[in-house]
Amino acid sequence: MLSSTKTQGKNLMRLPVAAALVLAGVALFAGTATAQTGYVGILGGGPVYKNDDKTNIKELKTAGFTELLVWSVEVNASGDLNLNGEFPLTSGGKYIGDQTWPKFAKALKNIKTGKVTRITLSIGSSNVGDFQNIKALVDSQGTGKKSILYKDFAAIAKALPIDAIDFDDENSYDEESTVQFALMLGGLGYHVTMNPYTNNTYWTSTVSAINTQMPGLVDGIHLQTFAGGQGNSPCSSEWDFGDVPVFPGLSDQPGAPPFKTPTAAEAQLKTWHSQCGITGAWLWIFDQIAGTDQVKEYAKDMTKGVNGE
């Protein structure tokens, strides 16, 4: 995906941890992939948390979108999490987001009292480093309860109403560490989604490996069909993830072509629904249309499109 506003375990010693997470998570996630009915989502950055007047929160709560993707979480070399390089979320495995934006947790909870039923935290972007750091941390510490990644996401789970973690890896593509990281998240109660734009063989293999060990953990694919993903189709065989539904992402931003108006988005989604029965989609990016009537227009028209109306 476009850059943010600031522009495999390696040995057998990890197997007991992975196995424990699988045993803990299978009952939780079994069958959820086929039960997935789809979401119409919107991805947003700074405007989701920089909101003293509550206008953006009200828009997101009432517009009609059913999923909010909060983007982009950066993972530094020590394992600390930060939104867009300007909003520290964790330090040393403890949640510190309330020090910068104390109303963030309350705002997300408020959003979920409206139309939004799922909040997803998206990691990565076109920036190099996030998933390389995750790989290094998994290699050095594993994913057990004493690891920094486990502590980070346990702290996030306690502080914020996050349902899923989205993997927007655009340059690391290490299957082994990604699988271990995903299984850890599943053990903590999260679902996992993927956010690809290229390298389909990596993504299909990784999703298969994850869901083989913890069925239903990966329950959606946020496929980019704009910018670097221009030309991608959720109906293409190269993006076939079996029982895991593919939700195409459309762009409201002229700088991330092809730009789609609400009406054009509806038409495109209706075509894909007719071709392969898509049940969901998502919009890049809330930041472009925050404070305008287009938020509701996109939600309404995209919902009609994925329903084939």
Show which residues each predicted segment covers:
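N-terminal secretory signal peptides that target proteins for export/translocation
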Residues: 1-13
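Sec/Tat signal peptide C-region and signal peptidase I cleavage site
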Residues: 29-35
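Fungal secretory targeting signals
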Residues: 14-18
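Short glycine-rich, acidic/polar surface loops and turns
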Residues: 268-270
